[in-house]
Amino acid sequence: MLNKLSLLLKDAGISLTDHQKNQLIAYVNMLHKWNKAYNLTSVRDPNEMLVRHILDSIVVAPYLQGERFIDVGTGPGLPGIPLSIVRPEAHFTLLDSLGKRVRFLRQVQHELKLENIEPVQSRVEEFPSEPPFDGVISRAFASLNDMVSWCHHLPGEQGRFYALKGQMPEDEIALLPEEYQVESVVKLHVPALDGERHLVMIKANKI
């Protein structure tokens, strides 16, 4: 699996240390093991997880601005866990409302010795925003409209929303409230992944 991960990273133009690669593989192995009992993801094959979960998450890393992020609706830690491994200088709050997912995240934190994550069981609307975050990240969590509506209190004055999407979400962009603007949309290159992937970056308009 290490060889496959190395080839995928090379294709994506991402350089990681051996320690980071081993952490990513350890996470995939834990996800595969716990998935049998906890049903954390529909992806069953660890090699497929490398593409659809690991690479699909970490290709976003170069676009994240700041050091304090919250991954809303993180599920089994996607994209937050892979991002925390490739961005060890940043801190990631991993938010999910389901206890079994948060228990898994805490076990990952313990076994991988990840000191830059904080798994939290909470609904996003009820989660406090102090201090505010540099970035609010979501992967398959909600529509853009729901994301900014439910998470409006989380980013700081210069903070951004980072939404990982499949095809270009033109309809969702058109429905954004006028107090928000799309700063940019990046077409992502995810090696060996069928279908398009986009990162939508949103900021609140200055009043």
Swiss-Prot record:
<feature type="binding site">
    <location>
        <position position="78"/>
    </location>
    <ligand>
        <name>S-adenosyl-L-methionine</name>
    </ligand>
</feature>
<keyword id="KW-0949">S-adenosyl-L-methionine</keyword>
<dbReference type="Pfam" id="PF02527">
    <property type="entry name" value="GidB"/>
</dbReference>
<keyword id="KW-0808">Transferase</keyword>
<dbReference type="InterPro" id="IPR003682">
    <property type="entry name" value="rRNA_ssu_MeTfrase_G"/>
</dbReference>
<keyword id="KW-0698">rRNA processing</keyword>
<dbReference type="InterPro" id="IPR029063">
    <property type="entry name" value="SAM-dependent_MTases_sf"/>
</dbReference>
<comment type="function">
    <text>Specifically methylates the N7 position of guanine in position 527 of 16S rRNA.</text>
</comment>
<protein>
    <recommendedName>
        <fullName>Ribosomal RNA small subunit methyltransferase G</fullName>
        <ecNumber>2.1.1.170</ecNumber>
    </recommendedName>
</protein>
<dbReference type="GO" id="GO:0070043">
    <property type="term" value="F:rRNA (guanine-N7-)-methyltransferase activity"/>
</dbReference>
<feature type="binding site">
    <location>
        <position position="73"/>
    </location>
    <ligand>
        <name>S-adenosyl-L-methionine</name>
    </ligand>
</feature>
<dbReference type="GO" id="GO:0005829">
    <property type="term" value="C:cytosol"/>
</dbReference>
<feature type="binding site">
    <location>
        <position position="139"/>
    </location>
    <ligand>
        <name>S-adenosyl-L-methionine</name>
    </ligand>
</feature>
<keyword id="KW-0489">Methyltransferase</keyword>
<comment type="similarity">
    <text>Belongs to the methyltransferase superfamily. RNA methyltransferase RsmG family.</text>
</comment>
<keyword id="KW-0963">Cytoplasm</keyword>
<feature type="binding site">
    <location>
        <begin position="124"/>
        <end position="125"/>
    </location>
    <ligand>
        <name>S-adenosyl-L-methionine</name>
    </ligand>
</feature>
